[in-house]
């Protein structure tokens, strides 16, 4: 029987082993989650570290702060979807979950780093010490309003122009203090006021 098949249909049987030896072609499937591409390799490595790590996260680097915190002019800062769009675009999350709040600042990194050497003022929680900017900075405060797991995160976007409160940490490689977290963006009162020695807004009588 086999001899008859080979004689009758020689070509298909000869091509069959070649087809079996060809590499399997995988079809690309689009997903809702934006996995990092080659130019986002560092983001992907950070994602793996956050997802599988059981200890504290790495302190932020200069490049991470520039990618995750600082913004450029483009979409209007008072746009209702600003935070939802920016957070997903910058892949801001923690262990596959939405972050509860976030600040984006319209400024250069060098300007932000200089704040680390300003005087200490109370943070918004009243416990830790923060450094406050000397001038007003434009930015957006993002507050989570819907969902807890990516990519369904929805945020309320609030435009602010005020004094930035940040925490800083020492980086051995640069031998400098660098921004660690954005604690608050405090809008000054509309009426006449001044800052006390502790950096607290005081309304004169």
Curated annotation (Swiss-Prot):
Residues 1-26 form the signal peptide. One of its GO terms (biological process) is defense response to Gram-positive bacterium. Glycans are attached at residues 131, 143. Disulfide bonds join 98-153, 116-168, 123-130. The keyword Mitochondrion does not apply. Keywords: Disulfide bond, Glycoprotein, Secreted, Signal. GO terms for cellular component: extracellular region. Coiled coil: none annotated. One of its GO terms (molecular function) is nucleic acid binding. Its main location: secreted. InterPro entries: RNaseA (IPR001427), RNaseA-like_dom_sf (IPR036816), RNaseA_domain (IPR023412). Transmembrane segments: none annotated. Gene3D superfamilies: Ribonuclease A-like domain. It is found in: Secreted. Belongs to the pancreatic ribonuclease family. Does not exhibit any ribonuclease activity. This is Inactive ribonuclease-like protein 9. It comes from Pan troglodytes.
